[in-house]
Amino acid sequence: MDAVTINSFFLVAALLVGASVLLSALSSRLGIPILVIFLAVGMLAGEDGPGGIHFADYSVAYLVGNLALAIILLDGGMRTRVSSFRVALWPALSLATVGVAITTGLTGLAAAWLFDLNLMQGMLIGAIVGSTDAAAVFSLLGGRSLNERVSATLEIESGSNDPMAVFLTVTLIEILATNQQGLDWFFLLLQLGKQFGLGAGIGLGGGWLLWKLINSARLAPGLYPLLTVSGGLLIFALTTAIGGSGILAIYLTGLLLGNLSLRSRSTTLSVLDGLTWLSQIGMFLVLGLLASPHKLLPIALPALALAAWMILFARPVSVWIGLLPFKNFAPRERWFISWVGLRGAVPIILAVFPMMAGLPNAQLYFNVAFFVVLVSLILQGSSLPLASKLARVEVPAPPSPINRSGLEIDLDSQWETFVYRLSAEKWCIGSPLRDLRMPKGTRICALFRDQELLHPSGSTCLQSNDILCVIGHERDLPALGQLFSQAPEQDLGPRFFGDFLLEAAANMVDLAPLYGLDVSEVADQTLGDFLADQLGDNLVVGDQVEWQGLIWTVAEMEEGKPRKIGVRFQEEDPV
């Protein structure tokens, strides 16, 4: 490769990435997922588009796809709170194993019939498109405030279901390549256990060693993110090399690092955010370049039928069966989880496997997978806001600062700076600072008014559009949010929870005269205990029950237990 070729590569890459970044603004205006924008830019630059770039190197696509996916999962793991496992771990694992197997089987049967393939070839297509995609799920759910049970289940499922899909894909490729007639089920189960066991063991063990290394090393601040990424990729590669699931390993590594005290945590997350965006852009650009629209047209109708079968039948059946043991999921939550079975880069990367193995019909497998992913992202991704409202799984977004950054003062305490802009309707407007009920251990360190820095004192009265800088901890965010945060554009709070918030510790017998309730059967219970009896354990914000003409909704949680309960009349529409 000469200097001119290298420079041309830099020029084209910079143009494509820059165009993807600038065009990403169209996502919100057109109501389509941002990943579709990146994919479309790649297709337009490809051989059938105005760019005319001929790219058919599947090994490079495999390299870029795996590298990008590893970084995305590392970032996703670091942003997942382990507290969400309280409500979502076992349901997500059920969907990641049983759910993927059922989706593969049902989709494979349809693929064999639609494309006139034998059963094993159809099952290979089912395995390729059988898993949800972490990049798509993290990207599309990141900006939405869904109830914790639903969002955590979808995120953990997408981060842990790839081992099953990879295992099924590799196994079926081996069967087709060697013309095997029978299956050694014991061997297959052993291999599946190896994938999950090594992935989980090395991911957690390697993550713990990486955590100790990061906290003990004395480096320039900018080097800690590089150490984190390189360590995560090392764990990913080592796990894959010995037959485990590198994808699961790096997700668990990120999960462990994100839930422990980590040196330069804020800087690392900031760098990872940029790398994740670059990974998504690069991965979908390459996959878009790899696709040839003229090759998709001949299989468009059967591929569309397969996508519809998977979205409307295979995925819902797998979700309903996978979640059968878990009674906490309401039918509307099951329906939403069924609908958000987003396919993304993983199926396309898995479709590269048959190409590299030289299987017959390999191009067909790739084209079908690409078409299914495109339909999934456009149809399911674009309808996500509407689906969340119809399923009533969207809850009012918790108040949050307009900016936050870490203070590397004490590794164990994890101090942060939170920036708040005061809106006119906040109750603290006009109040002196001495009257604010600040959370213990927090301090207002700066106040900006009309672009000027003021020295705040106890007698300073707050005004609309003041900007406050507060030092505190992550655990202080709920209380600070109630004091200072900008109200959302559409305040769902009163309409969703009701005008009255009651203490979960309130006795039912005390509430009876206020609301005209017959509490003879629950007179000895608190309101929180009553809801737990009605809805089961592991409650989340947004859980609700209709009882005696009123709707009772969990409004706040504290340490896994309800703290505040909203109450409203049934005729009030929360949406």
Swiss-Prot record:
It holds the Pfam family Na_H_Exchanger. It catalyses: K(+)(in) + H(+)(out) = K(+)(out) + H(+)(in). GO terms for cellular component: plasma membrane. The chain crosses the membrane at residues 3-23, 30-50, 53-73, 95-115, 122-142, 185-205, 232-252, 271-291, 304-324, 335-355, 364-384. Gene3D superfamilies: 1.20.1530.20, 3.30.465.10, Regulator of K+ conductance, C-terminal domain (3.30.70.1450). GO terms for molecular function: flavin adenine dinucleotide binding; potassium:proton antiporter activity. Residues 404-486 form the RCK C-terminal domain. GO terms for biological process: cell volume homeostasis. SMART domains: CorC_HlyC. It is found in: Cell inner membrane. It is a multi-pass membrane protein. Keywords: Antiport, Cell inner membrane, Cell membrane, Ion transport, Membrane, Potassium, Potassium transport, Transmembrane, Transmembrane helix, Transport. Its main location: membrane. PANTHER family: K(+)_H(+) ANTIPORTER NHAP2 (PTHR32507:SF7), NA(+)/H(+) ANTIPORTER 1 (PTHR32507). Belongs to the monovalent cation:proton antiporter 1 (CPA1) transporter (TC 2.A.36) family. NhaP2 subfamily. K(+)/H(+) antiporter that extrudes potassium in exchange for external protons and maintains the internal concentration of potassium under toxic levels. This is K(+)/H(+) antiporter NhaP2. It comes from Aeromonas salmonicida (strain A449). The lineage of its organism: Bacteria, Pseudomonadati, Pseudomonadota, Gammaproteobacteria, Aeromonadales.
